[in-house]
Amino acid sequence: MGFITKAIPLALAAMSVVNGAEILETRAGVQTLADKYIVIMNDGVTEKAFDSHRSWVNRTHRRRLVRRGAKAMGGMKHTYKFPTGMKGYSGHFDEDMINQIAKHSDVKYIERDARVQINAITEQDNVPSWGLARVGSREAGGSTYYYDSTAGEGSTAYIIDTGTDIEHEEFEGRATWGSNFVDDMDMDCNGHGTHVSGTVGGATFGVAKKSNIVAVKVLDCNGSGSNSGVIMGMEWATNDAKKKGADKAVANMSLGGAFSQASNDAAAAIANGGVFLAVAAGNDNVDAANSSPASEPSICTVAASTEQDGKADFSNFGQVVDVYAPGDSITSAKPGGGSQVLSGTSMATPHVAGLAAYFIGLGMPGGPGLCDTIKQKAIDAIANPGAGTTGKLINNGSGK
């Protein structure tokens, strides 16, 4: 699930109904994970009913293995419980078992789990970043970042990505490890997540230089993971933010793929939980309405601009885009120290998450409504933004 150059799609072409529950069908070419599924429960299913359903699934799965000699499968793997009420689980089931689950009256729909992948491009090291200067200026071509000294102090940014090098000098001890849903290595062995984190809250490269960074790892060293694993990270971040104060929290997902109802529903659950969420529009130069979670309307969807205030040639576009942000040749932190340059809507998105954290530091109300604040303060700057797309470029309101 990554937007730097190209992403393996998680497309859902059509819905079929199997005795009541929708089983979402994947398009040709999607790299699904064999016999692995995401099950989402009906709205309003109680904790008691959910517990009963999961017990039934576990019992039925075990009986199939023992009594029927069914193909060995892992069964239920992870349970999703968002504070806003969204419930579900992922698991490893054969076709007969998943059809039994689909018949259960408490099940809303089922998606095949799918593999996701990022592909980063490193251009060069140790060059100045133009993105920060653009966020703090009403005119292109500046070299100074103007910002209020509060700099996002008191805010927390959840970076749902490949992890973050929390020891990097950019973070000055403000970065912590949250949780890991992809492997047993609590480190960023890819570099994408550290770069994103640096743009949000790095001392040199960050929009909100005093914000706290929390690493939520959902992609491995190759930038690869699963849709179910990403949703696990989304759930964890939402629940952790609720404990610490959702109104002071922002989340960044420089991830995505083709349309996924489960991904969109999880993104909506983050927003409904009171957490601002910035998501990459995608890098295929197509309408982002076909991308997830970018197409979820309750979040802030970000397209990428160039240093000359043009639409980056790779950036997705369309009515679902809320705002543009710098995303072409952006310098930020890399694991182990120093910096690197990356391009993509992945790089544009943390400028927006960082700006949300910056506004929280100024005392503005947090939550998904911050996207409206960001749009109100944005400037009309993007030439040829794409059909039906806003030309608004983010600005921190410094007045410079």
From Swiss-Prot:
Q: Which EC numbers does the record give?
A: 3.4.21.-
What superkingdom heads the lineage? Eukaryota
User: Inhibitor I9 domain: from which residue to which, for each copy?
Assistant: 36-118
Q: Which residues form the propeptide?
A: 21-119
This entry carries the following GO cellular component terms, namely: extracellular region
Q: Which SUPFAM superfamilies match?
A: Protease propeptides/inhibitors, Subtilisin-like
The protein in question is named: Subtilisin-like protease 7
Q: What enzyme class is recorded for this protein? A: hydrolase
| Cleaved signal peptide residues | 1-20
Q: Which CDD domains match?
A: Peptidases_S8_PCSK9_ProteinaseK_like
Question: Which is one GO molecular function term here?
Answer: serine-type endopeptidase activity
Keyword Signal among UniProt keywords: yes
Q: Where in the cell is it found?
A: Secreted
Is Cell membrane a UniProt keyword of this protein? no
The active site consists of: 161 (charge relay system), 192 (charge relay system), 346 (charge relay system)
> Which family, according to UniProt?
Belongs to the peptidase S8 family.
Instruction: Show the Pfam families listed in the entry.
Output: Inhibitor_I9, Peptidase_S8
Q: Name its species.
A: Arthroderma otae (strain ATCC MYA-4605 / CBS 113480) (Microsporum canis)
- Please give the function described in this protein's UniProt entry: Secreted subtilisin-like serine protease with keratinolytic activity that contributes to pathogenicity.
- Residues modified by carbohydrate are 222, 252, 396
